[in-house]
Amino acid sequence: MNLILLGPPGVGKGTQAKLLIDRFGIPQISTGDILRAAVKELTPMGAKAKGYMDSGALVPDEVVIGIVEERLAQEDCQKGFILDGFPRTVPQADALGQVLSGMGKSIDHVVSLSVDKEELLTRLTGRRACANCGAGYHVDFAPSKVAGVCDACSGQLVQREDDKEETILNRLSVYEAQTAPLIAYYQAAGVLRSVDGLGTVEAVQGDILAAIRA
């Protein structure tokens, strides 16, 4: 099964991907992770990416696509994969389709997880991390025993810059601008499966499984 997970920051893609990995025994492919790995291993595409990164430039789509292609050619992807955070744009989706076609493969399902903006803000702005040991908490869903104090080391709990409302609203705006065309793209291809991400982890997982088996 070849699967793409789409959804805004905070919707729960990472959590759901882990459950799907365990169920189907296929790897999760995150572009950030494979980019770092390719650069570290100095694969042909990793070497190209390193040149851009060392100069402070954005890695162009054709190099990112090349790194994705290198990863998809590996043995553990032969029975399927879960793409998380890629593609982000219609040109990337077109390029991915061409790469997969050359391998005799295609995307089976694109699961689009959605949650309303207020819920996403609650999930993301409530995150806290220990400034000392890095332990994670949430003011609503996983609070520390003493407000603002780490259970593990008594360090101070802080809100990261990435979890502040202004930053999150900007990330959501960028996501919406990039991804709305992608949703239409995969809907037209007949592979889009829309799933409500509001619910327990188990309930959302059940809805995903039902959607891809329908």
Curated annotation (Swiss-Prot):
GO molecular function, one term: zinc ion binding
Pfam families, alphabetized: ADK, ADK_lid
Annotated compartments: Cytoplasm
Keywords annotated in UniProt: ATP-binding, Cytoplasm, Kinase, Metal-binding, Nucleotide biosynthesis, Nucleotide-binding, Transferase, Zinc
Membrane-spanning segments: none
Top EC class for this record: transferase
Positions that bind Zn(2+): C130, C133, C150, C153
Tree of life domain: Bacteria
Residues where AMP binds: T31, R36, A57, L58, V59, G85, F86, P87, R88, Q92, R160, R171
BP GO annotations: AMP salvage
InterPro entries listed in its UniProt record: Adenyl_kin_sub, Adenylat/UMP-CMP_kin, Adenylat_kinase_CS, Adenylate_kinase_lid-dom, P-loop_NTPase
Coiled-coil parts of chain: none
Pathways per UniProt: Purine metabolism; AMP biosynthesis via salvage pathway; AMP from ADP: step 1/1
Stretches the record annotates as LID: 126-163
PROSITE patterns in the cross-refs: ADENYLATE_KINASE
Domain notes: Consists of three domains, a large central CORE domain and two small peripheral domains, NMPbind and LID, which undergo movements during catalysis. The LID domain closes over the site of phosphoryl transfer upon ATP binding. Assembling and dissambling the active center during each catalytic cycle provides an effective means to prevent ATP hydrolysis. Some bacteria have evolved a zinc-coordinating structure that stabilizes the LID domain.
Function as written in the Swiss-Prot or TrEMBL entry: Catalyzes the reversible transfer of the terminal phosphate group between ATP and AMP. Plays an important role in cellular energy homeostasis and in adenine nucleotide metabolism.
Family: Belongs to the adenylate kinase family.
Quaternary structure and partners: Monomer.
Name under which the protein is recorded: Adenylate kinase
Annotated organism of origin: Geobacter sp. (strain M21)
